[in-house]
Amino acid sequence: MKRLFLVIVLAILTMAAIAQEPYKAYCEIVGTGNITGTKVKIEVDFGQKAKWATPNARFLVDENGEKMNFNSMIDAVNYLAKLGWELILAYPVTPTQGMSKDPVYHYILCKKVTSDEQIKEGINLKDK
């Protein structure tokens, strides 16, 4: 009986040691509007490795591979909140050069995960 109890306790301790502690993963979403100002395109940066031709340019796409347009940045945040992301910080950056003086919105989000595979769960990305 003592041996069985010892085996069970060791099995439980082993499983507890294997279980990973959740950690926070972060991403940045950058929103840019179109000419009509009616929709926002969202670029996502998970800190992924940059590609030579399109460094860190990743847009949210639907199941058909089409770029997703959102009504506003909050619409995009709500979409990501359904996937477990939480808004941490938001700030605008206004261009100082060029024709457009419209601000580009940057939002920082975080999500608790236990593996890197969970970071992009439910999110489809496509280069520009």
Spell out what each predicted region is:
Residues 5-6, 18-128:
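Terminus-proximal functional modules
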Residues 10-18:
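Hydrophobic h-region of N-terminal signal peptides that target proteins for export
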